Amino acid sequence: MQYSEIMIRYGELSTKKKNRMRFINKLKNNMEHVLSIYPDVSVKTDRDRGHVYLNGTDYHEVAESLKEIFGIQAFSPSFKVEKNVDTLVKAVQEIMTSVYKDGMTFKITAKRSDHSFELDSRALNHTLGDAVFSVLPNIKAQMKQPDINLKVEIRDEAAYISYENIRGAGGLPVGTSGKGMLMLSGGIDSPVAGYLALKRGVDIEAVHFASPPYTSPGALKKAHALTRKLTKFGGNIQFIEVPFTEIQEEIKEKAPEAYLMTLTRRFMMRITDRIRENRNGLVIINGESLGQVASQTLESMQAINAVTATPIIRPVVTMDKLEIIDIAQKIDTFDISIQPFEDCCTIFAPDRPKTNPKIKNTEQYEKRMDVEGLVERAVAGIMVTTIQPQADSDDVDDLIDDLL
């Protein structure tokens, strides 16, 4: 027998009573975006559960995609069969004989939404249970925590049988918590920060600073590849490339070396905040981890934050590097992140950056520059690209080819 659909059980949105349908509609939209790589698959949702119709598509590939989508608590692949007792008996016997192993226990859980069906739920439980005993006489029934819980649902159009319950990603559907601007470098931390923001329902737009010719086309391609990895959790992501060469050259020329990183980050924060304002974002998200590098001390964060009143979310701020790497490997961004392309934060990195910069000093150095003009020109020059989910490709090999 071949699976015909996958039944979706919702996650935390079950607690969002007043906004429930808004959350469900957003989840449906996200599933459609992520599953768009399977042209024959369709999605339907109602108040209690969702349904992914396979229409001949390989179940295992679709299931792997569903495991990543936030807002799904669990899902079950289902067999669609004709709605009569004889057909149900044969289907249940075939399924049970294929999955049963010595010593396993079972339970039949029948449910009717079509009350015109000839047997009620209790009678159907008994009939199908007897059918299992007739082909597996040594099997034992167990009502609490059986090894196999065979669920039979009688709907208006057909009957559906399932026995697997696969854990989903949980969290909230992406987009239900508003929009945030992710400051995406090419490193390990910022994609992980983006992933964790997505899990809490934030619709992220990736802001990436490029400084050609100091940063290469390969660095930009790397940032695109990292963004594409994040699309599998909720669908399309807007990638915003910011021209940053003029600003970095200006900072290099007019500020002391120890303050290069602080001033660079302050400009990045200003620009990201301006983009957020123009694109109706609510927060800024970055991959800062406390004490990991010179620009991530509390004093540095304070000096950098001083340029905006917008909330800054730092999902990995308390994590050790190994904890961040574990998540990066889980979400398949690590091997891309470690490819050796320089980004804006490394090309002019000073040997001894200031770890406790003073706000008054940074402001004094910025008076040597046309801060507003530099920010305006950078924002005016942004390029926005829609990054879409796609079938698995070897992004790492592509990046290595660029290096060679």
Curated annotation (Swiss-Prot):
NCBIfam families: tRNA uracil 4-sulfurtransferase ThiI. Pathway: Cofactor biosynthesis; thiamine diphosphate biosynthesis. Keywords: ATP-binding, Cytoplasm, Nucleotide-binding, RNA-binding, Thiamine biosynthesis, Transferase, tRNA-binding. ATP binds at M183, L184, H208, F209, R265, G287, Q296. Coiled coil: none annotated. This is Probable tRNA sulfurtransferase. The keyword Nuclease does not apply.
